[in-house]
């Protein structure tokens, strides 16, 4: 797999970021058990992240790039965004600080659209927490309204007016931070019937496309310690996600390379091995 994955992937490799439509960005954290002071950490720790980008071809979402990193640090996001030339016109993503920092540094002029599902989910989580801590009729009403708060400007305006009467410090702070983003997005997104398929409001298409990656890697997460090897596995998973996994095409590509190189692959497995005791993803 690690020797021939780049060979079969080459014909489908994207050579630049999409210049039209939207680029959806997110990361998939893979957690393992962890302990501190002899006690288990409930959520474990992130062993590695898989950064994913989805672009659009003829109005249909395609997994553009997938790459594993040891963490979601801004420097790793910068490396991911810099792995291809070009600049997208529009990015849809959640509010991950490392990602946003890297986007701002590399593509300062890009139209940045915060995923509206993640915004609404964050709002609903906040309200649920506040209701547990301090139940009130006002917060219960706001929780009921939150489900449709981001449908459009009118719904958001009604929600914001009711929120002001609740006088909840955490909610007021959330609205102060996020209202400018939400209202700016309302101003430029236009009516739904005029919105083309490659201008989504959420990262739902990315989540759907990358679900098989999670399914494939999660049971193996403890064994995945070599970054280069994992990235070559991700090449095959990308081909599968985009419907390009053809065993006959694979065989032709491998045979062509072997025939051109006296029956030997261009690389050896040892070339991507980690130094003993120094895994690249831990």
Please provide the spans of the model-predicted regions.
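Short, function-defining helix-loop hinge/capping sites that tune catalysis or transport
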Residues: 34, 102, 126, 215-216
């Amino acid at each position: 797999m690690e020797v021939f994955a780049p060979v079969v992937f080459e014909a489908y490799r994207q050579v630049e970021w999409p210049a039209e439509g939207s680029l959806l960005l997110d990361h998939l954290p893979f957690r393992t058990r962890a302990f501190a002071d002899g006690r288990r950490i409930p959520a474990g720790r992130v062993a590695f992240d898989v950064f994913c980008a989805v672009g659009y071809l003829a109005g249909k979402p395609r997994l553009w790039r997938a790459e594993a990193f040891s963490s979601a640090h801004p420097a790793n996001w910068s490396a991911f965004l810099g792995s291809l030339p070009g600049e997208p016109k529009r990015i849809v993503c959640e509010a991950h600080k490392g990602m946003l920092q890297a986007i701002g540094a590399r593509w300062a002029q890009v139209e940045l659209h915060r995923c509206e599902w993640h915004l609404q989910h964050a709002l609903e989580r906040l309200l649920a927490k506040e209701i547990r801590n301090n139940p009130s009729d006002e917060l219960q009403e706001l929780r009921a309204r939150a489900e449709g708060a981001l449908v459009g400007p009118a719904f958001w305006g009604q929600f914001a007016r009711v929120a002001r009467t609740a006088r909840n410090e955490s909610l007021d702070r959330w609205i102060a931070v996020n209202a400018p983003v939400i209202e700016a997005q309302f101003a430029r997104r236009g009516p739904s019937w005029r919105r083309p398929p490659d201008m989504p409001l959420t990262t739902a298409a990315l989540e759907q496309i990358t679900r098989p990656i999670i399914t494939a890697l999660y049971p193996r997460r403890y064994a995945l310690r070599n970054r280069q090897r994992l990235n070559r596995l991700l090449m095959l998973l990308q081909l599968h996600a985009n419907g390009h996994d053809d065993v006959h095409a694979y065989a032709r590509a491998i045979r062509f390379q072997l025939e051109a190189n006296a029956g030997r692959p261009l690389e050896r497995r040892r070339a991507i091995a980690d130094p003993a005791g120094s895994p690249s993803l831990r």
